[in-house]
């Protein structure tokens, strides 16, 4: 699947930054210079959404994040033009601050998280916006108000107990929705955090740039650190991991920089790597 200049139903851009599956099993693909592409469950052709001069189109070609809310709307975080909401019933995009709601400070979106009432939007050097889903009001928190050492937020995760996990260039923070204050967890060091998820067993997985992957048990606070070991084919394939995903069958997969993608083997506590040698088009994978 790639961009074909001669086919208007192909991908709009070969630089893929984000892949997201919605509740209808449709696939959304965010790109670096081609906006967002959509393919329905049984489709073979992509619909392209790019900025146009007419109203209610996406605000940017540079798509960083995609998330679906409880009503089936797709929220699109861009790297240079704020946050858009796509309504699948009307087929239009609305930008926060342009078409609905007050202006959001989150013009450079790095992370999105959907809960029952809000969309949490982490920004580049500008803290966090909480956007009320129904009236689009925006509540802003600076990095200082949240207790962060710096104001960028690269990863957001809500665990089964309602705790919010934040990742940035200073490591991992965890906090409470009611107080909106966060505490840095020193167990993860001063790692640059790319992604955080909670798996179906309740473990917190943390992906870093240059420092591998952490697996953390919130119950007993035990932590395990996985890194690439030269010559070890069943170790993590790269220490720079951009994304973590769990499949419906409970498999944990990792996208890496120059290491292809890895699957965690739970029983053996090791990894299987899939790279250009196994047919991937590139050894650098994103979201």
Label for each model-derived stretch:
Residues 1-287:
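Carboxylate-rich, polar loop motifs that coordinate divalent cations or form catalytic acidic clusters
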């Amino acid at each position: 699947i790639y961009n074909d200049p001669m086919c208007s139903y192909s991908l709009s851009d070969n630089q893929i930054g984000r892949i997201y599956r919605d509740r209808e099993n449709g696939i959304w693909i965010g790109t670096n210079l081609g906006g967002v592409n959509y393919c329905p469950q049984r489709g073979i052709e992509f619909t392209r959404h790019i900025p146009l001069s007419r109203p209610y189109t996406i605000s940017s070609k540079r798509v960083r994040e995609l998330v679906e809310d409880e009503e089936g709307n797709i929220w699109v975080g861009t790297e240079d033009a704020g946050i858009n909401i796509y309504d699948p019933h009307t087929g239009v995009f609305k930008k926060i601050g342009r078409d609905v709601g007050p202006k959001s400070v989150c013009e450079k979106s790095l992370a999105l998280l959907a809960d029952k009432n809000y969309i949490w939007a982490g920004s580049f050097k500008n803290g966090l916006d909480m956007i009320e889903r129904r009236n689009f009001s925006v509540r802003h928190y600076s990095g200082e108000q949240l207790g962060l050492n710096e104001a960028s937020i690269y990863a957001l995760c809500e665990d089964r107990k309602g705790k919010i996990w934040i990742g940035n260039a200073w490591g991992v923070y965890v906090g409470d929705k009611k107080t909106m204050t966060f505490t840095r967890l020193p167990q993860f060091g001063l790692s640059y955090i790319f992604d955080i998820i909670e798996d179906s067993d309740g473990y917190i997985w943390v992906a870093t740039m240059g420092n591998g992957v952490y697996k953390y048990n919130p119950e007993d606070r035990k932590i395990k650190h996985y890194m690439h070991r030269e010559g070890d084919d069943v170790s993590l394939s790269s220490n720079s991991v951009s994304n973590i995903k769990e499949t419906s069958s409970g498999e944990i997969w990792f996208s890496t920089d120059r290491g292809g993608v890895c699957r965690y083997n739970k029983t053996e506590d090791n990894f299987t790597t899939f790279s250009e040698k196994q047919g991937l088009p590139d050894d650098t994978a994103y979201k």
